[in-house]
């Protein structure tokens, strides 16, 4: 059985997501959003959405399309099909954990999209800061 190392995002300096997979075990390093100033999808109007945030993030290239880490409810389309045929956490045999190196947005901002069954590890101070940011709606 071979070990696979994959760079999902971050080769241009931000939005780091790297995985190491061996059999049905996967370790992901960081889970951030890339900074892409060259994209021009912002039109000056911000409308807060509570639904489809994962699908929107994948469409915009703000998070990675990876099987087995996202909740089925966030991937299910109106017709019952799965968004881009991404396999949800609930249907996957892959055992995944995410390690966050430090609390910068380009390293951890997308952990909010992960299924609650995916363990996320980070330094205690980073976890405390993340909780404080979530409490003021900035996390």
What do these predicted ranges mean?
Residues 5, 20, 30, 102-103:
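Divalent metal-coordination and catalytic microenvironments
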Residues 25-99, 126-139:
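Pre-active-site segment of Zn-dependent metallo-hydrolases
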Residues 14-21:
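Short beta-strand scaffold segments in enzyme catalytic cores
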Residues 6-8, 13:
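Extended recognition/assembly regions associated with phosphoester-bond processing machinery
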Residues 25, 116-119:
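A short helix->loop->beta-strand "cap" motif at the edges of active sites that frequently abuts
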Residues 1-3:
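Transmembrane beta-strand segments of Gram-negative outer membrane beta-barrel proteins
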Residues 9, 124-126:
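Residues that form ligand- and interface-recognition hot spots within folded domains
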Residues 91-117, 124:
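Di-metal (Zn2+ and/or Mg2+/Mn2+) metal-binding site signature of metallo-dependent hydrolases
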């Amino acid at each position: 059985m071979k070990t696979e190392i994959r760079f999902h995002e971050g080769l241009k300096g931000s939005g780091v997501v790297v995985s190491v997979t061996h059999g049905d075990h996967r370790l992901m390093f960081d889970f951030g959003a890339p900074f892409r100033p060259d994209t021009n999808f912002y039109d000056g109007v911000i409308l807060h959405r509570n639904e489809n945030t994962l699908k929107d993030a994948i469409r915009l290239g703000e998070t990675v399309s990876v099987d087995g880490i996202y909740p089925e409810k966030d991937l299910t389309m109106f017709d019952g099909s799965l968004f881009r045929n991404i396999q949800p956490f609930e249907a996957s045999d892959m055992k995944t954990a995410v390690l966050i190196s430090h609390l910068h947005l380009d390293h951890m901002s997308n952990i909010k999209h992960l299924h609650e069954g995916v363990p996320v590890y980070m330094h205690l101070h980073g976890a405390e800061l993340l909780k404080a940011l979530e409490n003021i709606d900035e996390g």
